[in-house]
């Protein structure tokens, strides 16, 4: 179940992640009140399709199961639900 990198990046930005550029595209989560958090993931510049393995790794970086990560980027999981999940895990205050 590979996904297009463009769709993943768009989904992350829509859920409160802000993109920064370097040798990779980094996405750092900013809480609903605008505070930067330590929750982050990255995508490569050269990849158009993201493999199932990489999706699993990105999910782990964001403290989600692979299914929940796909729900986050495909929109069934809202930003508020994701933030509540992170608060429940004590990853953000």
Where are each of the predicted segments found?
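Amphipathic alpha-helical segments
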Residues: 1-18
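A short, structured beta-strand/loop element
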Residues: 19-60
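Charged/polar, solvent-exposed surface patches and flexible loops
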Residues: 10, 14, 60, 71
């Amino acid at each position: 179940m590979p996904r297009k990198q463009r769709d993943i990046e768009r989904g992350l930005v829509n859920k409160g992640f802000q993109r920064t550029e370097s040798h990779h595209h980094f996405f750092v989560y900013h809480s609903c009140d605008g505070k930067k958090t330590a929750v982050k993931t990255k995508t490569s510049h050269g990849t158009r399709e993201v493999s199932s393995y990489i999706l699993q790794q990105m999910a782990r970086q964001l403290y989600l199961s692979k299914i929940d990560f796909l729900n986050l980027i495909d929109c069934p999981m809202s930003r508020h639900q994701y933030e509540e999940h992170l608060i429940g895990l004590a990853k953000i205050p």
